Amino acid sequence: MKRDDEVTGRLPVQPISQDVLVQKYLKPGEQGADDLFQRVAAALASVEKEELRDTWRERFLANLQAGAIGAGRIMSAAGTGLEATLINCFVQPVGDCIQGQDADGYPGIYEALREAAETMRRGGGVGYDFSRIRPRGAAVRATASLASGPCSYIDVFDRSCSTVESAGARRGAQMGVLRIDHPDVLEFITAKRTPGRWSNFNVSVAVSDAFMQALEADGDWALVHRAQPGGALIAQGAVKEGDRWVYRRLPARALWDTVMRSAYDFAEPGILFTDTINKDNNLRELERIDATNPCGEQPLPPYGCCDLGPVILPRFVRHPFSIGGKAGFDFDAFGAAVAVQVRALDNVLDLSFWPLPQQRAEAMAKRRIGVGFTGLGDALAMLCLRYDEAEGREMAARIARTLRDAAYAASVALAREKGAFPAFDAQSHLAPGTFASRLDPALQAQIREHGLRNSHLVSIAPTGTVSLAFADNASNGIEPAFSWTYRRKKREADGSVSEYQVEDHAWRLYRFLGGDIERLPAYFVSALSMPASAHLAMMEAVQPYVDTAISKTVNVPAEFPYADFKGLYQQAWNAGLKGLATYRPNTIVGSVLDAAPAQAQPEAQAAAVAADPMRAQIESRPKGALNALADKIEYWTSQGRQTLYLVVSFLPLADGRERAVEFFMPVGQNGESQQWVTASMRLLSLAARGGFLERALADMRKVAWDRGPVRLGHYRKADGTLVPQWHDSEVAAIAFAIQNLIARRGNLEEGASPDGASSIEAPAPMAGAKCPECGAHAMIRKDGCDFCTQCGHVGSCG
């Protein structure tokens, strides 16, 4: 049968794929993916016995070439000699104290912050459970004060992430989790309704079975913590029950509605069903899991790690689209690739640099890995199967079962060769109810006899940039394709704008093989063209074969009824899923943007500057009266509507033009910002008379503060519609207003006007983290990965 990789080998490389490969993965001297594979294979083989290294280097290389790749950190850092971790993500414990350790041995808040900063500096993303931190208003006996609560400390962790630059220039993502019974859960749920707050975090609520049962019974729910409340909270009704304090009770349905409203309108929080996670855990007798990595596919104990590597499913489709023969999936080749991948990821644990000794100790004790797959949506289309129909789900389940069985069998073989993981105990590992207890009896017998090399083996992660770079933009992870093609504009470092046609792998392969893309077959079904129930049904089909979790986003249309939306989460819990994230385009947050900073034009030659009256240096303010324009500037901050009056003075030029030479703010205006806005105007006046006004305004547009985005003006999208524009600070917003004011008089340099910001052809943007590429607060979780709905940028966890 004709292999898909033989066909795709003749496909021209997409420019976007080549650029991602070069920018994120290739190292100096590497010319292409094969050079990179050589580097990674040699690194993985280096931890084998010396007499086996050449053999395994060749096998690892062949497996990489066949489509079994590592996660982003492995492909980027393996074999480089950098002290950067090969692990994508970790879970960082956080205790209920400031320094040292709390009563249960968890690191204090600022010790946890230090450890997380070191982890991110080395290239890892971090997940946290903040539930141990005492609530706002709880008593702090050591200082006779009241606690500020976990949300205030999440602000600190968020700002730290903004400051820390990760190894390899990738800023680590973060996941914040809070239990549904924490007294501050309402504040946590609604925190990200403020645009830009916690922009470096995904957030999820840990929901227990007890809460879901209270919800079904329409009962009350207690918000509890073991920390004693302050006097005011006790006066309001907080009472002690056993070893904990009940801070308040409220209807479970009211609390759930707050969660659902935020998810429906603001795309967060996600939901983690932590009781399901812990009951299914092979190591449930040894550990408690309360958090996940930032993308949710790895529920992890304190200091646990994500050692992940997907296998590209379209590479194992034979006769795609039944062209030249009946389409089929090569299960034997896939199983063989999975077996080699288990060894490769097990070697990563020994090869990796570990940011913290606790992380290394945890990894060595349990040797968690996560073999997964990517490109499921594309593979099903190539097999002429619809993602949203029973036949497609049956094929996906068969693929997942093959993955599970091949991975566990390979881990048994590794245990025979290298030894079982130190914490292995057959009785507890195979106890009724664990994931391993559902394996085939013959495989369980082998585990009892020989043990397992790895406590966990399967994880369906998002693939983000590795899918772009190594899989020809195949659909991510378990997801269907989000769209078959779109255009993406990217602002380069020199200020120029590059435009890409981004195409889905299956779509472009179908065209390459002679298919009519104007009349796509019915099995080409995208994420937004199928019902939400189909997304959940696919998770239900695959989850039984995954010993950790699945990172997946359930896409629903903007008009999806709220009642049905809430029902998705109830259905997910009833189905035994371990979590759920949703994506719904909507009008409330669909316009929360932050325009790319205006770019300064390249400096002209000195002689040209001197000859240009708009840029010639003026030693001092011209004497006498100048034409002036006063402008009222209205903008919105987290404190509400704000107003400033600014005056701009213009110098008439001989050619009839006017040059802005003076900016000031009349005295007597209220507000603590007046002094630094006034100072900025004085500096801008000096810049204007020095001939570099445009550059100064562009620099001001980049100024950021820590009080959240500022709304002023509008952004014009590619289709001509206007949406509100957001800025990183008050100064940045005022600079934007000045650019508009000068542009209205026709005196701003060409290309330096606020309209110079690039418009992006993309789906309607949603509120989220700030995109590092276009600047919009539109980074959401799509396909379980960070994705900018404004410009198409794919971020972390890929």
Language-model features: locations:
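Short Cys/His-rich micro-motifs in 6-15 aa windows
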Residues: 792-798
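Short, Gly/Pro- and small/polar-rich lid/capping loops
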Residues: 444-446, 595-645, 759-767
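Conserved, charged catalytic cores of large soluble enzymes
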Residues: 2-57, 142-156, 168-281, 310, ...
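Internal maturation/activation junctions in enzymes
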Residues: 337-360, 364, 368, 386-463, ...
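Acidic/polar, glycine-rich intrinsically disordered N-terminal extensions of enzymes
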Residues: 1-86, 90-93, 241, 256-265, ...
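Short cysteine-rich clusters marking metal-coordination/redox-active sites
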Residues: 771-774, 788-791
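Function-dense linear segments that define catalytic or interfacial modules
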Residues: 27, 41-48, 61-142, 150-153, ...
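Catalytic alpha/beta core of large soluble enzyme barrels
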Residues: 11, 297-299, 345-350, 433-437, ...
